[in-house]
Swiss-Prot record:
The keyword Nucleus applies. Pfam families: PAC2 (PF09754). It comes from Nematostella vectensis (Starlet sea anemone). Forms a heterodimer with psmg1. Chaperone protein which promotes assembly of the 20S proteasome as part of a heterodimer with psmg1. The keyword NADP does not apply. Disulfide bonds: none annotated. Belongs to the PSMG2 family. GO terms for biological process: proteasome assembly. It is found in: Nucleus. Signal peptide: none annotated. Keywords: Chaperone, Nucleus. This is Proteasome assembly chaperone 2. One of its GO terms (cellular component) is cytosol.
Length: 244
């Protein structure tokens, strides 16, 4: 699945590194926030390879990170992999959706690559539909998180940041007073729920950071999600977000 830029390299050892990647979800907020992350690391990140698989639709476009007067004529592809050794980060930017019917196959191959690379932890940036909120979610911050059981120690760190965990709901269709089984509900989240469940099953340390939103101009949602991530990982100074 991973295709390196350098020759004679298959997979790399990323022990101690945090992997950040987006879910293709409502409003494309996770992808926009990932663009902000990569752009904010311009002085320390470099392209190390690509993710290539039949489950990812082919896309090609102009350089998303070109600055006026400094265009290099580079192209962006469906799924690119960047590294910042200084920040101990590996960032995947996925610009294309997953083929219909291939979600399970995509999660399986992506997770196999993640485990081979020995990442310290994985962060998935996502979004969920604001129209499906319950009453408790209508007030306060639209930002939420959830973590797999193996990374529950992060919850104490998130509590210090006053973050709110995504509220669970009664399992549909058993929404009765007698039903006490709860689950995460992620409408519009794309592959988020399936990937989370797979990481939970295989004891992969995963934190999902997400925001409630609707389709439209989602720039503000993306900035909020990136700042949410930045409060935790301290990727860049808040005053320089995306300016590089």
């Amino acid at each position: 699945m991973f295709v390196p830029c350098a020759e004679n390299v298959n997979d790399l050892d990323f022990s101690g590194f945090t992997l950040i990647l987006p879910a293709v979800s409502i409003g494309n907020v996770g992808q926009l926030a990932t663009d902000l992350t990569i752009s904010s690391l311009s002085s320390s990140r470099h392209l190390i390879g690509y993710l290539h698989d039949a489950s990812i639709l082919p896309v090609v476009g102009n350089d998303a990170f070109a600055r006026l007067g400094h265009e290099k004529g580079e192209l962006n592809l469906s799924a690119e992999v960047y590294q910042s050794t200084e920040k101990r980060l590996v960032i995947v930017q996925q610009r294309a959706p997953i083929s219909k019917g291939h979600y399970a196959n995509y999660c399986q191959k992506l997770l196999a690559w993640i485990k081979r690379c020995s990442f310290k932890q994985v962060v998935l940036l996502s979004s969920i539909s604001a129209t499906d909120r319950v009453d408790a979610q209508l007030q306060g911050s639209p930002l939420r998180y959830m973590t797999t059981s193996v990374s529950q120690q992060l919850s104490s760190s998130f509590d210090k940041l006053s973050w709110v965990q995504l509220e669970k709901r009664p399992k549909f269709p058993d929404m009765t007073k007698e039903s006490d089984e709860l689950q995460f509900y992620l409408p519009g989240g794309g592959v988020t729920k399936r990937f989370f469940d797979r990481c939970e099953k295989e004891d992969v340390p995963l934190a999902v950071l997400m925001t409630f939103c609707s389709e439209g101009d989602n720039i503000a949602d993306a900035v909020s999600l990136f700042l949410y991530l930045n409060d935790w990982l301290e990727i860049t100074n808040k005053d320089t977000v995306g300016v590089n």
